[in-house]
Regions:
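Substrate-binding pocket helix/loop in short-chain dehydrogenase/reductase
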Residues: 100-101, 108-113, 217
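Conserved small/polar residues in nucleotide/adenosyl-binding loops
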Residues: 257-259
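Residue(s) in the substrate-gating loop at a strand-loop-helix junction
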Residues: 144
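Alpha-helical segment proximal to the catalytic Tyr-Lys
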Residues: 129, 173-174, 245
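Conserved glycine-rich cofactor-binding loop
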Residues: 10, 17-18
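Active-site helix of classical SDR
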Residues: 124, 160, 168
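Short, small/polar-rich loop/turn modules that mediate ligand/substrate recognition or access, typified
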Residues: 176, 181, 247-249
Length: 259
């Protein structure tokens, strides 16, 4: 029988202002986990902490943090651990600026690596020891299809997401026998604010409109449409559950853009 219950588990989700992160927080909570998440502004915190979970046992707590800054990330980790150890970590925070390689400075590269990659490294390094100690843990890296199929317009983004996949596989090999399962999720075209922004930029450059761009891009997916944040959250929830006890080191794409 499929067991998706997360009752009694404590989870952390980074970058949950909206989109995939928000959906993951809600779904983990609905399945019984108590979730701590971070966002950059108070409105996002309030919006999500007011969510009425389907589970009477779960709690949702939001903390303001800028995960592109080491000190802010460390403060988030410290405050989270003050309430006890973590069983589940979902490294979701990230940005995907579209820019020309020839005009990207060293600072541009460093800033995106701090946010997309080093935030995940810092959180994993801090929360993983307890998982090893108790012989049970889940670490999910929200990577991207760009980590496997790089885009000319998202060079630095793709590089950070490729690195997340590599780190995930290495950690899976290192800690799998300790009961800590580490996997990557590679969302493709998911209808989020990020893709709406990208569609708008394409539309402006081509003289079209964003809705037409989204529809056309959706046809490149075998299913014929963009995915939803909730569909990504469903996969994450499964990977965090006991029913995913033999999935380790996987890099799961959804949905395929390239076949």
């Amino acid at each position: 029988m499929l067991d998706l219950s997360l009752q009694g588990k404590r989870a952390v989700v980074t970058g949950a202002s909206l989109g995939i992160g928000e959906a993951v927080v809600k779904m983990l909570s609905d399945h019984g986990a108590s979730v701590t998440f971070c966002a950059r502004n108070k409105d996002a915190i309030t919006n999500l902490t007011d969510y009425k979970s389907e589970s009477p046992h779960s709690k949702i707590k939001g903390l303001i943090a800028d995960m592109s800054e080491a000190s802010s990330t460390e403060n988030f980790i410290k405050e989270t651990l003050e309430e006890g150890p973590i069983d589940i970590l979902v490294n979701n925070v990230g940005a995907s600026p579209s820019r020309n390689f020839l005009y990207m400075s060293d600072e541009d590269w460093r800033d995106l690596h701090e946010l997309n990659l080093l935030s995940a490294v810092r959180c994993t390094r801090s929360f993983l020891p307890h998982m090893r100690e108790q012989k049970w843990g889940r670490v999910i890296m929200i990577s991207s299809s760009a980590g496997k199929y790089p885009s000319a317009a998202l060079i630095d983004y793709g590089a950070t997401k490729s690195a997340m996949i590599s780190i995930s596989k290495s950690l899976a090999k290192k800690y799998g026998r300790d009961g800590v399962l580490v996997n990557s999720v590679l969302p493709g075209l998911i209808h989020t604010a990020m893709w709406e922004r990208a569609a708008g930029e394409i539309a402006d450059a081509s003289g079209g409109n964003a809705e037409e761009v989204i529809k056309k891009n959706g046809l490149s997916v075998p299913i014929g449409r963009y995915g939803t944040s909730e569909e990504v959250a469903s996969l994450v929830t499964f990977l965090c559950s006991n029913s995913a006890s033999y999935i380790n080191g996987a890099a799961i794409e959804l949905s395929l853009i390239h076949i």
